[in-house]
């Protein structure tokens, strides 16, 4: 087929050259285009010492081209037969006779592998795992299967219905204490204690903030008047307090502190 397309392209090139530059009277080539592209293609092929190709049946022409190349003709109406003939030419077994599973199994057999599919994909998967030296996996319960896989890896099974217990078991495997028993505050405090920090929340967020500040070496901050607290903070950091009632004065004071 590629040869046919090449020939047509050659003919087109010859024809275009003919139009672009008419041949002189002394040329041994015939003029080309008289209205029938097939006749013209055949004339061009004849000039090249090749047989004409197209007389109306593309299959016959393809087979003729294959014959020119020393190959057997291929297509007589049944693409499967033709494919099998091509495989035979390459020294391969034919593949498809109507049952794709049989064909797949035949291919696996060629590779020295056992056939796989007889109707139950789980059985087939297990058979494949067995071939690899692994245990079968799925019998209906994904949790049991996961645990079996973990056991194969030398790990303990994990999930028996309570995700918190399972999380704690995992933490225990890592040498860590379990965390959650129902009270997130207690758990947070336990975690802080593990890190060498004091527990924090006991009901009053202001007390907790002050407790944090004290732990860091700062005095507690909020006792009811946010302006007083800001002034105390500014004083502690060596900055003079800013706001006494007039925001413009405060802004100007801030600018003055910056040398502006």
Swiss-Prot record:
Keywords: Secreted, Signal, Virulence. The keyword GTP-binding does not apply. Residues 1-20 form the signal peptide. Disruption phenotype: Leads to complete loss of pathogenicity when hum3 is also deleted. Transmembrane segments: none annotated. The keyword Isomerase does not apply. It is found in: Secreted. Its main location: secreted. Rsp1 is processed by the subtilisin-like endoprotease kex2. Cleavage by kex2 generates 11 peptides. Repetitive secreted protein essential for pathogenic development. Hum3 and rsp1 together are pathogenicity proteins that share an essential function in early stages of the infection. This is Repetitive secreted protein 1. It comes from Mycosarcoma maydis. The gene is rsp1.
